[in-house]
Each structure stands twice: as C-alpha cells, then as structure tokens.
Regions:
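Cofactor-binding loops of NAD(P)H-dependent oxidoreductases
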Residues: 51-52
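Terminal hydrophobic/aromatic helix or amphipathic segment near a protein terminus
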Residues: 214-260, 297
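An amphipathic alpha-helix signature
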Residues: 209-213, 230-235, 282-285, 290
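Conserved acidic residues
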Residues: 47, 68, 96
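Amphipathic terminal alpha-helices
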Residues: 269, 274-297
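N-terminal Rossmann-like NAD(P) cofactor-binding module of classical short-chain dehydrogenase/reductase
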Residues: 64, 68-71, 99
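Hydrophobic "lid"/C-terminal helical patch
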Residues: 184, 188, 215, 255, ...
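Oxidoreductase cofactor-interface core, primarily capturing Rossmann-like NAD(P)-dependent enzymes
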Residues: 2-41, 55-58, 65, 76-84, ...
C-alpha cells in the first residue's frame, strides 16, 4: 500500500515542487485555499485536492484520516493558527509523522534580545506545535532562497543597479527552492524515527559583494552595493521602493539578524537527506534569472 501524504500549501512554489517530486510514489492529498490553487495542485500531480480554510478547524480531521504523514507549508506571514489547526487535525486523526517548512530566522532569533521578527515568531510558535503534537517529525529551516531577485525590494534595487542589504560586510549561503523541495520530498518518502531539526543552505558562503557581482555578470552591467546600516537601510527602502516607512522597518527587522551574522554557515543537510549536493548560486542564476525578469510584474 502506498503512502498517504497530506500537504498544506500544495499550490505554492515549494508545495508544487514537492508534489511533482513525489509523483506517483505516494497518494498526495493537497489542501489549498482557492480554486486557482486547486488547478495548480492538480497540475503538480496531487491525487486529491481539497479547497479548505485553515482558519476554520471544523471538519479538517476527516481529511487526514488514514494519512501516514502531514507536511505543513504556509506563507511566512500567515497567522500561527493556520498551521496549528492543520497540525492538531492531523494529530487528532492519528497521523504519526509531521514535516514542517520553517525558516532559519528561528535559529537566529534564539538568544537575541528583544522580540523576534513576525516571521520568526510565527514559525517558532508552529515548531512548538509540531513538537507538542508529534513524537516523530522533521523541521526544515532553510536560509535565504537563491531566488533573491524575486523579492520585490531586491528586484527594485537590481533594476536601479544596486543590491542593497542592511550591512555590506556580511554573507549569505543562498539555497535553491528545488533543493528545499527535494529535501522535504525525501523526508516524506523515507521518514526516520525520532525527531530532526535541519538547517538548509546552499553549498557555499557568498559575501554580499559576491552576490552583487554574480547579478552584475548576469545583467551585463555593474551592480553597486551601498554601504548601509539597518537604520539607513530603512531610508533606502522608502527611497528606492514603494514601501511605507512601517513596511521598510518590518523588512529591515527581518533581514537584520542575517546581516548581523558576518559569516553564514554552510550545512550538509541537503546532501545528507537527498544524496546529492545542493545547487550553486551561479548555476541557479544561469537557469532561472534573466534581465527581462526585472521588468516583469
């Protein structure tokens, strides 16, 4: 009998990849939030698709009946109750294993003074839900995506010949979305006993200057890295993007814990779980980035 896997957020950019990678190796039940999401999940290969409102927990448990695992993938700015309702419904239905897509921001928020940024706070709350409800689970904490140029504020900067970050003298280890999805798919298809919390990164640490240089090579034109602080980065955002001051402060709060860490670590978790090395940033750009993408909405 094949595995039965229930995936929330199966219509998003990671969820669809997970469905495609699993294919007919398991019976996928996709939970999506709209008719458009239904079409995307079906096209990605989900065997069953249900349009549900995760804010309304009534009736969710029956969708998890007989499932071997639940995978929760929701937008970083979603309210904690959405994942909590899905996880509690899965546990109530007797599902024994959970995989959660979290964020490295949780790692960086641990031990930092003050309140964590909203994304770290939400993921931290839902990680606690996973740990409370399941004896077997895997939590994956990817760092920044290699698709940095898809972030509106990065795209706006690149279109103006700049790659702005709260600090110039720092680094990232960007990870390709395909590698995140491949790790999640492998964890679902071959669940291990016990619990795992995995930090996911790309294969190399790149300085902000190096990242800008790779974009410059892809664009065929210079990309400047302005010398900013978290405070002046807020001013940069309000000047170079449509963000309000409040939105800019929120964005700076999310990025600053990463910017304060000068040397981004590299993890071998992707290769350990999937059996292959993660994609290099330059290879990701060659396959996925073009100058024309900066003018596309």
């Amino acid at each position: 009998m094949s595995l039965k896997l229930v995936i929330t957020g199966a219509s998003g950019h990671i969820g669809t990849r997970v469905c495609q990678l699993i294919g007919d190796q398991a019976h996928i039940v996709a939970l999506v939030g709209s008719a458009e999401g239904r079409e995307k999940a079906q096209a990605a290969g989900a065997a069953e698709v249900h349009v549900v409102d995760l804010d309304q927990p009534e009736g969710l448990a029956e969708l998890f009946a007989g499932a071997d695992a639940v995978c929760v993938i929701t937008a970083g700015d979603a309210k904690p109750d959405r994942e909590r309702n899905a996880l509690e419904a899965a546990a109530k239905a007797g599902v024994g294993y959970a995989v959660k897509l979290s964020s490295e921001s949780v790692t960086l928020a641990e031990g930092r003074p003050g309140e964590p940024d909203p994304i770290a706070a939400r993921h931290s709350a839902n990680e606690s839900d996973v740990q409370r409800l399941f004896d077997r689970f895997a939590i994956v904490r990817p760092t920044w995506w290699a698709s940095l140029d898809q972030l509106p504020f990065v795209k706006a900067g690149l279109a103006q010949g700049q790659f702005a970050w709260p600090r110039r003298d720092t680094s990232l280890a960007p990870i390709a979305p395909d590698d995140v999805a491949a790790t999640i798919a492998a964890l679902l298809l071959k669940p291990s006993a016990g619990t795992r919390v995995l930090s996911l990164t790309g294969p190399e640490t790149l300085t902000i200057e190096q990242i800008a240089g790779h974009y410059a090579a892809a664009l065929g034109s210079p990309v400047e890295v302005p010398d900013l602080t978290p405070e002046s980065y807020v001013d940069w955002l309000t000047e170079h993007t449509p963000m309000t001051n409040e939105q800019a402060q929120g964005t700076s709060a999310i990025l600053t814990p990463f910017a304060d860490r000068r040397d981004a670590p590299v993890s071998d978790a992707v290769e350990t779980v999937t059996g292959r090395a993660p994609q290099r940033f330059t290879d990701y750009l060659a396959a996925n980035f073009s100058p024309e993408s900066l003018t596309q909405k």
